[in-house]
């Protein structure tokens, strides 16, 4: 980061990103956003008004902030902002992390100057963009300085007992909580467990589970500080298959079990990574209905560290620096 670099994050008013961005002390501005649906809904008649409003709001924020470059990673909020950037002749970059491009990124492609991607097969799906660059995962700086010892202190963990981390992200936490619930007591036989339940998730699980009284079970709604340390401490991570968390796990070479959010691009991510022997993939339904049987098979065949190393081979280090270099390359050439 250059000393003079300034940032503005444009997002939805009530989205999960707002809290994280504000805690990182990055200026945040909310803009209206419609949902780009592929299916029939009465809201399809209303959403164009929100999209238009998002375009006007995006235009006003860009006029005021005067950025040298705009970066989008595929949210619905991004589309009107990308077109506002095109209107103002501000370079726009798409960060395509997932294997399968979403509708938002496809709609932004005609007005984008560059594409940054993780998987080779993704590049061919954006024929209108001439400048393309494959990089490794873009991750938080704290991943590189993470220490397991700090996680022991912060979260009250036993320094010697192995750890399983369960995390479902924002929208995907509730379904994962329900699926993993029957398996918890069996995991606690050999492991301590940190379970990121999501907001309100602990209230759902507590009346049902005797695990809450177990000394090695640590339910936490969200982690605002120390997530890198927690990942460093973990021996196995059960997670959704979003590329944000997967990139961090790849850098740390962690053995990972993927439970993708059903019916989403995460299933494509998980399937590709499993086919390359870089993580295990189990559906949410199978985990809920046959979790113990599945776990026994997994545990019998597991070779500690093998899949974590393979994940790192697929998603190699250096992406954060490469992405920053591209941004400055584009801004310096304006």
Q: What are these language model-derived features?
A:
Residues 40-69:
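An amphipathic, basic-hydrophobic alpha-helix
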Residues 72-73, 227-268:
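A donor-sugar binding/catalytic signature common to diverse glycosyltransferases
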Residues 297, 316-334:
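C-terminal alpha-helical cap of glycosyltransferases
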Residues 20-24, 148-153, 157-236, 246, ...:
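Donor-nucleotide binding loops and adjacent catalytic segments primarily
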Residues 3-50, 135-136, 283-286:
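Conserved nucleotide-sugar phosphate-binding/catalytic loop shared by glycosyltransferases and other
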Residues 303-317:
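A short, well-ordered alpha-helix in the C-terminal region of glycosyltransferases
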Residues 15-19, 58, 67-88:
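An aromatic- and histidine-rich active-site surface loop
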Residues 16, 27, 86-149:
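Active-site-proximal region of nucleotide-activated glycan assembly enzymes
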């Amino acid at each position: 980061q250059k000393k003079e670099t300034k940032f503005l994050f444009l997002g939805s008013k009530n989205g999960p990103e707002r809290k994280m961005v504000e805690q990182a002390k990055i200026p945040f501005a909310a803009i209206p956003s419609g949902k780009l649906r592929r299916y029939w809904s009465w809201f399809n008649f209303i959403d164009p008004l929100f999209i238009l409003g998002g375009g006007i709001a995006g235009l006003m924020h860009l006029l005021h902030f005067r950025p040298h470059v705009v970066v989008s990673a595929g949210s619905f909020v991004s589309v009107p902002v990308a077109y506002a950037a095109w209107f103002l002749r501000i370079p726009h970059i798409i960060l395509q992390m997932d294997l399968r491009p979403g509708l938002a990124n496809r709609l932004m492609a005609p007005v984008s100057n560059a594409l940054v991607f993780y998987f080779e097969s993704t590049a061919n799906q954006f024929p209108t963009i001439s400048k393309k660059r494959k990089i490794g995962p873009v991750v938080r700086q704290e991943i590189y300085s993470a220490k397991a010892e700090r996680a022991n202190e912060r979260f009250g963990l036993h320094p010697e007992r192995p750890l399983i981390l369960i995390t479902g992200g924002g929208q995907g936490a509730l379904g994962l909580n329900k699926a993993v619930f029957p398996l918890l007591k069996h995991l606690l036989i050999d492991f301590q467990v940190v379970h990121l339940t999501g907001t309100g998730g602990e209230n759902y699980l507590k009346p049902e589970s005797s695990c809450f009284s177990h000394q090695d079970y640590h339910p936490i709604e969200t982690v605002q500080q120390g997530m890198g340390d927690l990942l460093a401490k973990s021996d196995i991570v059960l997670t959704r298959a979003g590329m944000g968390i997967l990139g961090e796990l790849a850098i740390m070479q962690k053995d990972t079990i993927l439970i993708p959010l059903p019916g989403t691009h995460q299933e494509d991510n998980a399937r590709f990574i499993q086919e390359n022997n870089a993580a295990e993939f189990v559906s949410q339904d199978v985990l809920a209905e046959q979790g113990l049987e599945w776990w026994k098979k997994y545990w019998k065949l597991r070779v500690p560290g093998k899949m974590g190393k393979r994940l790192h081979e697929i998603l190699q280090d250096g992406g954060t620096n490469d992405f920053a270099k591209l941004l400055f390359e584009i801004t310096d050439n304006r």
